[in-house]
């Protein structure tokens, strides 16, 4: 299994055709997706475009849907929730479809939606994703960071390194296929004893701190190997728990 890491979706070659893709947005989309599905959401349907989201949501029964919208770290007006993993509790999301659009994560998902096996990862479901990849045994895996508005993201690279390192621990058949994957693994080794500190140090972590009290979000996003859920694309843009 060859592991490639791309810091942002635009770095992935246009002609790339990996057997599997793993999208990461630690702060906070893929963490929120994992917790929402763990807490019983029927599915998370991701959108890069807000008008597309609204149109799809309108076709869904009102009592079975929630709109999750975030731009610049803040909840969008008229949406039920923002992008906080601690807000997607069972009483709120169980049995519902979540129509979601965020600054970075859902756009990254849109870039790789044609890949045969598409999953999302965050620190809380790292082990589950690693085990799923080993079970499926794709020849090539593209880990795609969401970044921040097209630029490098420290926390996404941390999680990419955490996943790549765990895959290498579990199987000698796993190789790191580009320098970005090697660098991400080294980053994980540097911060693995205190991932929350890395998240807070990152520029997007600092952005969230300036926006207000996000301590619960930081703790949630930094929690390692807590979930068994693997959000998996079942149809274009639609992620369900597998």
From Swiss-Prot:
Its EC number is 3.1.3.71. It is an enzyme of class 3 (hydrolase). Keywords: Hydrolase, Magnesium. It comes from the Bacteria. Belongs to the ComB family. HAMAP family: ComB (MF_00490). This is Probable 2-phosphosulfolactate phosphatase. It comes from Parasynechococcus marenigrum (strain WH8102). The gene is comB.
């Amino acid at each position: 299994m060859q592991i490639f890491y791309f810091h942002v979706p635009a770095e992935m070659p246009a002609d790339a055709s990996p057997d599997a893709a793993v999208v990461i947005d630690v702060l906070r989309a893929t963490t929120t997706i994992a917790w929402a599905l763990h807490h019983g959401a029927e599915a998370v349907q991701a959108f890069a475009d807000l008008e597309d989201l609204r149109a799809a949501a309108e076709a869904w029964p009102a009592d079975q849907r929630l709109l999750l919208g975030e731009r610049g770290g803040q909840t969008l007006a008229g949406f039920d929730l923002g992008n906080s993993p601690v807000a997607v509790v069972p009483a709120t999301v169980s049995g519902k479809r979540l129509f979601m659009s965020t600054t970075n994560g859902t756009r990254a998902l849109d870039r790789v939606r044609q890949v045969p096996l598409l999953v999302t990862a965050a620190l809380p479901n790292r082990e589950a994703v690693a085990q799923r990849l080993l079970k499926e045994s794709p020849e090539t895996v593209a880990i795609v960071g969401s970044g921040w508005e097209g630029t490098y993201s420290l926390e996404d690279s941390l999680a990419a390194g955490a996943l790549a390192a765990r895959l290498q621990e579990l199987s000698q058949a796993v190789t790191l296929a580009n320098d970005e994957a090697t660098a991400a693994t080294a980053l994980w080794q540097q911060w693995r004893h205190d991932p929350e500190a890395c998240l807070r140090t990152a520029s997007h972590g600092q952005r969230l701190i300036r926006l207000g009290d996000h301590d619960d979000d930081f703790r949630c996003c930094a929690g390692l190997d807590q979930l068994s859920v693997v959000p998996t694309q079942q149809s274009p843009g639609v992620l369900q728990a597998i």
